């Protein structure tokens, strides 16, 4: 089983159509990886599906970087 970090990065790369090497922890979905608002919604849905969790809208709005997504999943899967 790959780590949460690896799984999040793979999902981000697939959802945003970028290479996994471009998906750095500090990367912003919008500013660095070219996501728009629809992309970010679809990204959150993909994370919810992968990790079998529900991310409330008010929390999803705060997840703007790869690291924030990793941190959220780590904190809420325990």
Curated annotation (Swiss-Prot):
The record's subcellular location field reads: Cytoplasm
Source organism of this protein record = Cellvibrio japonicus (strain Ueda107)
Pathway the protein contributes to: Lipid metabolism; fatty acid biosynthesis
* Gene3D superfamilies, per database record: ACP-like
Start and end of every Carrier domain? 2-77
Record-level GO BP terms: lipid A biosynthetic process
Gene symbol here is acpP
Q: Which GO terms describe its cellular component?
A: cytosol; membrane
PANTHER family referenced in this protein's UniProt entry, alphabetically: ACYL CARRIER PROTEIN, CARRIER DOMAIN-CONTAINING PROTEIN
Mostly located where?
A: cytoplasm
Q: Which residues cross the membrane?
A: none
Q: Coiled coil: which residue ranges?
A: none
Q: Which keywords belong to this entry?
A: Cytoplasm, Fatty acid biosynthesis, Fatty acid metabolism, Lipid biosynthesis, Lipid metabolism, Phosphopantetheine, Phosphoprotein
Q: RNA-binding as a keyword? A: no
Q: Specify the protein name.
A: Acyl carrier protein
In this chain, where does the modification O-(pantetheine 4'-phosphoryl)serine occur?
Answer: 37
